[in-house]
Structures are given as structure tokens and as C-alpha cells.
Amino acid sequence: FTLIEIMVVVVILGLLAALVVPRIGPQVAEAQRTMARSQIKSFEEALEMYRMHNGFYPSTQQGLDALVKAPTISPVPKHYVEGGYLKKVPDDPWGNPYIYRNRNGRIQIVSTGPDGEEGGEGEGADVTNDD
């Protein structure tokens, strides 16, 4: 191949990449949001099982880790399932820990989204169980 032929191929590949990459970005972001919603749904199901066995949800202080290992701080569950309710608590799709709150029996689970901070709008918006 001549240098000109190779340069033409590189330019064509560059143009194709310029057309394809912008279309993939939004799909990746939506896939991450869908994954976060799915993980939050799994947490809700495990939390409901925890509540059915013990009569209450884990406290905010106990957090989602109470689904993996029996809490030792109050309120201590009396009927904790051997092996726990989840094998582990994964981070959200952006690598951030989920935020769990128990406000008088009302559960809130938050993924802080791609910006890693609570709040935000648009692509930086949080994903919650309230969505």
C-alpha cells in the first residue's frame, strides 16, 4: 500500500468514528440509568423481605449492608435469614455507593448518577426509588 492509500483509509475510519461515537454515548448513559433502576428494584425487594421477617426496615445507620450481614446495632433483627438477603451491595453503575435512608419507615434509595453528587438535573440527575 502507498502512503496515500493508508492516509485515505485512516481519514475514512476517522469520519466513521465521528458519526458513530456521538450516537453511542446517549445509549450508554441510558443503559447505566436502567442498570441503576434495576439494582434499586432488587434492593427494594430484599428490603421488603427483611421487613416481612423482622417487622421493620434497617435503620439509616445500618444501611444496605444490613441486607448482606446481620446488623449488630439497634434495632437488631430477631429473625434474620441465614446467609442474608443479598450476597453483596454493588456500587451504582458509575462506581458510587448507593445512599439509603429510612425516614420513619419510608425508604429512600439514591444513586447519585454520573456526577457522584446528590441532586442534579439532566444527565447528572440522581436515580432513586421514587422515579
Set out the residue ranges of the language-model regions.
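Non-catalytic regulatory appendages
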Residues: 42-44, 48-51, 61, 72, ...
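N-terminal single-pass transmembrane signal-anchor helix
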Residues: 1-24
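Phosphate-coordinating loops and pocket residues in cytosolic domains that bind phosphorylated ligands
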Residues: 21, 26, 62, 69
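Extracytoplasmic electron-transfer domains, predominantly the class I c-type cytochrome c fold
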Residues: 68-82, 89-91
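Short, surface-exposed interaction loops/tails
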Residues: 26, 30-34, 41, 45-48, ...
